[in-house]
Amino acid sequence: MAKGASISGFPEWLPAERVVEQRVIDTLREVFELNGFIGIETRAVEQGSSLLKKGETSKEIYLLSRLQEVGHESDIPVEQRLGLHFDLTVPLSRYVVEHSGALPFPFKRWQIQKVWRGERPQEGRFREFVQADIDVVGDGTLPSHYEVELPLVMVNALERLREFGLPKATVHANNRKLSEGFYRGLGLTDIEGVLREIDKLDKIGPQAVTDLLVETCGATEAQANACLELAQVTAEDGQELIEKFNGLCEIHHIPFDGDEYAMAKEGLDTLSMIIDEARRIRPGSVMADLKIARGLDYYTGSVYETFLEGASDLGSICSGGRYDNLATQGNRKYPGVGLSIGLSRLVSYMLHRAGATASRMSPACVLVAVWDEENRGDSNAIANTLRSRGIAADVAPTAAKLGKQIKYADKLGIPYVWFPNENPENDGSDEVKNIITGDQRPADAQSWQPDTVYAQQTVSINADNR
């Protein structure tokens, strides 16, 4: 067999690391379902035509080919080929259209699944990774109150993950209509281009963005500077946001009675409502940040990015927005709003920077020893009795010396070793040993209970990171 080799961008967790990931998944699912979201799973592949028209660049999409097709892919248009989904929003839009007759609307769904994206691998960024999404999709219309509710659900979920070493999270929100109205008021026409370049601000800096706005979007130096001024606006309450935005409109001579301002005001009113309502329900969780653009072109209203306190180098760990035109069926539209957590990035952060560790790699609480192979049936019976009572148990793989069986349990992190009565015909009893504390005492598989602290796998973080 050929020796395996790691492939850049395709992470594999060790068993104890997988325990941490699973606890994160379980926690997110619990929060999502507490808020009424319904779980689904979609297929891994979509038509190339669906993937390409949703704003993702073709160089980041993985296409599928059968071995006999290699070398002949050019005979098939990319739009007709199958590709791995790069997010969970595009599959959701297709899923909603295909199953609209069987779904309740508004349809609230959660989805935790792998996605594939041909990005350059780096710390915290992978080519194969798990995303955790929540969306609400309406039939024809979707009330704006969901644009407040969903970021707050995500804030609640991320707050729950602080027990695994995640710092405090804050959602930064903007509105595409606000930005577009302002840009049009400046005289700019390539709105999608401007949004894409502004979205790069944190990555490449203001001067590089200014150059791109001038070179690729047809902006003058003055227009580019005005775009950057808008991107610098932040606010934690609605009135502050309105005053700052209107002040910029006055400076740049955008009339308050024009169509451009009317468009911007629609977004301004929604964004003000979002941060005021979020401030009332969960102070400090959501703020207005007008540099948030989101590069994907299917967003039409609110857009969100989420940042961790003290981890600016990690970038946004949860993003999303409102999309009114992503899912359509003839004249029928299914507007939605959703957010997505890059779960693999969070787990990588927890493992390598927050020091999250599992108490043990094995879910078993007890290893039942085997005196000799002739008596393995007795050990299996004890393990089955424990399992029937909800106590996870394993049986030693061989009837080795007890010292080796104990070492095996220790390697797996199993805290208890069960010693069956070696002479059942005598009046002796089984015994169980806590190999962490050294305590050993008689035990009956019908009634014994492990200490609470050792009963389940747990996840803890390095004390220095608390």
UniProtKB/Swiss-Prot annotation:
It is found in: Cytoplasm. The keyword Cytoplasm applies. Gene3D superfamilies: Anticodon-binding domain, Bira Bifunctional Protein, Domain 2. Keywords: Aminoacyl-tRNA synthetase, ATP-binding, Cytoplasm, Ligase, Nucleotide-binding, Protein biosynthesis. Its EC number is 6.1.1.21. GO terms for cellular component: cytoplasm. One of its GO terms (biological process) is histidyl-tRNA aminoacylation. The keyword Zinc does not apply. It comes from the Bacteria. It holds the Pfam family HGTP_anticodon. It catalyses: tRNA(His) + L-histidine + ATP = L-histidyl-tRNA(His) + AMP + diphosphate + H(+). Belongs to the class-II aminoacyl-tRNA synthetase family. Homodimer. This is Histidine--tRNA ligase. It comes from Bifidobacterium animalis subsp. lactis (strain AD011). The gene is hisS.
